[in-house]
């Protein structure tokens, strides 16, 4: 992320090629400082102290359900649980509620469990592959499985965005994180974010909500158990 006083521009690793051909432009990947500053100002409202405190009830409800499901031998995995996966279920449910006001019920149902490996694959394509494969047009030829899974992931993200936009148009849009993006107006043009920009931001919200927090919790659990 660019800080307010950053003097250097992000490298081509983030754009995966020329800026004008960048496929994914969001808070995490944009190299344009002006664009990044605008996006950071929008999302900062969702991360203010007051906002974070307002999330407490939702987070505690999910944690209580998480503990209940873990102690039930009849839930996913039987009496022995894969804690890495279970922390992913927990954080994804929290992300869904806070970002899209949608309960994915990852802790109680397996309908959305398919998204977990798709997120892993998408992250690998962005962070674990050589950018020149994209620049030279070789990625679709050499990374067939990853590219196919990326398309599935982007379709899934588009579906979540369409669902949230439909709620807003129906006058049922709750005060969640995505509402900040839907209500944003460009100061110069007065225009709202287009679908492509909304979908790109949804990518980073979904991945950050599930992937970055879950390993932290999992690591804390391991440290605590090893300290006993």
From Swiss-Prot:
A Pfam entry, by short name: p450
Metal-binding listed as a keyword: yes
Alphabetic keyword roster: Heme, Iron, Metal-binding, Monooxygenase, Oxidoreductase
Annotated EC: 1.-.-.-
Cofactors (names): heme
Listed pathway(s): Mycotoxin biosynthesis
Disruption of the gene: reported phenotype: Impairs the production of acetylaranotin and accumulates chemically stable intermediates or shunt products such as haematocin B, haematocin, terrespirodione A and terrespirodione B. Also leads to the accumulation of deacetylhaematocin and demethyl-deacetylhaematocin when ataS and ataH are also deleted.
GO terms, molecular function: heme binding; iron ion binding; monooxygenase activity; oxidoreductase activity, acting on paired donors, with incorporation or reduction of molecular oxygen
Lipid metabolism listed as a keyword: no
Catalytic EC class: oxidoreductase
Family annotation (InterPro entries): Cyt_P450, Cyt_P450_sf, Cytochrome_P450_monoxygenase
Binding positions for heme per the UniProt entry: 216
Role description: Cytochrome P450 monooxygenase; part of the gene cluster that mediates the biosynthesis of acetylaranotin, a member of the epipolythiodioxopiperazine (ETP) class of toxins characterized by a disulfide-bridged cyclic dipeptide. The first step of acetylaranotin biosynthesis is performed by the NRPS ataP which produces diketopiperazine cyclo-L-Phe-L-Phe via the condensation of 2 phenylalanines (L-Phe). The ataC domain of ataTC then catalyzes the formation of bishydroxylation of cyclo-L-Phe-L-Phe.
Family: Belongs to the cytochrome P450 family.
Official protein name in the record: Cytochrome P450 monooxygenase ataY
Species in which this protein is naturally found: Aspergillus terreus (strain NIH 2624 / FGSC A1156)
């Amino acid at each position: 992320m660019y800080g307010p006083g950053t003097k250097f521009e992000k490298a081509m690793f983030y754009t995966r090629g020329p800026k004008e051909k960048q496929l994914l432009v969001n808070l995490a990947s944009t190299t344009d400082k002006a664009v990044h500053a605008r996006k950071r100002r929008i999302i900062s409202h969702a991360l203010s102290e007051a906002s974070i405190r307002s999330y407490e009830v939702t987070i505690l409800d999910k944690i209580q359900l998480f503990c209940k499901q873990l102690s039930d031998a009849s839930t996913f995995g039987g009496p022995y649980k894969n804690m890495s996966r279970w922390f992913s279920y927990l954080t994804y449910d929290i992300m869904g509620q806070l970002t899209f006001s949608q309960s994915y019920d990852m802790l109680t149902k397996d309908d959305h469990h398919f998204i977990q490996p798709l997120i892993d694959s998408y992250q690998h394509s962005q962070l674990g592959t050589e950018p020149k494969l994209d620049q030279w047009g070789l990625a679709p030829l050499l990374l067939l499985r990853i590219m196919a899974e990326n398309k599935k992931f982007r379709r899934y993200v588009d579906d979540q965005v369409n669902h949230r936009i439909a709620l807003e148009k129906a006058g049922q849009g709750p005060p969640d994180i995505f509402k900040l993006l839907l209500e944003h107006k460009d100061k110069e043009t007065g225009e709202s974010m287009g679908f492509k920009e909304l979908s790109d931001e949804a990518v980073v919200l979904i991945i950050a909500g599930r992937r970055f927090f879950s390993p932290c919790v999992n690591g804390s659990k391991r440290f605590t158990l090893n300290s006993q």
